[in-house]
């Protein structure tokens, strides 16, 4: 049995009044296990609305929402903290070649002393992908690209010469140095059947978003992941399930399809229900000013929950082993 792990999702917004680095420092001071950030380098107004940002910035309508580049943001956070894990939630592969994914992840893992968990996804916003100048891809091709990217990334971390031919991405005599000093977990944000099967076969974790993966769908989704894990010769619980959940601590507020709200007791009760679905961790996404209050009033009760889980997040021994040289 493992204690439930709790992280906090910080904003990637670069609008006036936002300070995600300060929020991450606060999260570490209040004992959270990790911080995460979305990856939307070209976030149109439709994306902002879907993620709950709203269509406004600095009090005016926006066509493209102001955001930080996620890996740059997390690197700066790593430099300002010492313990807390860092998770891109999740890097969209169409924006980055696999060799860049592999190289930047190794560098960030080394510089952060082993604190990186690499979140990856196939990408889902065609408007963002087109705006960034990436080649147009079908949903099937994006899934092919994600699978290729994971294969190339893991091979580059482990082997001196990588030759790979994939449906979307390939590598010829690729040799990345240095290699990671410790394993870098890969979490996927998959939603559909093919992505869930890939998660079960190759991933270390699954980090779905409440607004896109409703609780009533979770049992079937987890069953797909577990079946794929077993078919690949892995344990059924090989994949850690971490739910990204927007939360609001307010006794007057009520939960909606995309938000868990209420008193501290209300929130704990609802999150406990999610552990009964099979989640072994939470990525809480509060308003920035509520990060301390959640840590004091909600997180201790969550940590009292004992749940079966496949593995813990990076340990202090792992962090020390990954010291930058």
Regions found by a protein language model. Name each.
Residues 1-325:
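Active-site-adjacent structural elements that line small-molecule/cofactor binding pockets in enzymes
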């Amino acid at each position: 049995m493992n204690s439930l792990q709790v992280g906090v999702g910080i904003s990637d917004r670069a609008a006036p009044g936002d300070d995600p680095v300060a929020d991450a420092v606060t999260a570490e001071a209040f004992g959270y296990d990790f911080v995460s950030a979305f990856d939307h380098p070209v976030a149109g107004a439709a994306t902002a609305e879907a993620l709950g940002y709203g269509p406004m910035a600095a009090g005016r309508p926006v066509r493209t929402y102001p955001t930080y580049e996620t890996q740059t943001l997390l690197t700066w956070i790593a430099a300002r903290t010492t313990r807390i894990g860092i998770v891109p939630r999740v890097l969209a592969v169409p924006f980055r070649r696999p060799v860049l994914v592999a190289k930047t992840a190794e560098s960030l893992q080394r510089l952060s002393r082993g604190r990186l968990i690499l979140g990856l996804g196939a990408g889902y916003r065609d408007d963002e992908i087109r705006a960034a100048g990436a080649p147009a891809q079908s949903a099937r091709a994006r899934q092919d690209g994600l699978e290729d990217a994971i294969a190339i990334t893991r091979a580059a971390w482990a082997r001196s010469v990588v030759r790979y031919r994939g449906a979307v991405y390939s590598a010829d005599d690729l040799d990345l140095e240095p290699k990671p000093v410790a394993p870098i977990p890969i979490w996927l944000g998959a939603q559909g059947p093919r992505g869930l099967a890939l998660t079960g076969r190759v991933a270390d974790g699954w980090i779905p978003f409440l607004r896109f993966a409703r609780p009533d769908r979770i049992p079937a989704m987890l069953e797909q992941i577990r079946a794929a894990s077993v078919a690949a010769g892995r344990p059924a619980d090989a994949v850690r399930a971490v739910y990204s959940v927007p939360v609001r601590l307010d006794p007057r507020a009520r939960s909606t399809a995309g938000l868990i709200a209420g008193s501290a007791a209300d929130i704990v009760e609802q999150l406990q229900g999610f552990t009964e679905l099979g989640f072994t961790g939470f990525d809480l996404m509060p308003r920035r000013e509520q990060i301390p209050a959640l840590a004091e009033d909600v997180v201790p009760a969550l940590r009292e929950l004992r749940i079966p889980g496949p593995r813990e997040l990076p340990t202090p021994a792992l962090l020390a082993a990954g010291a930058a040289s």
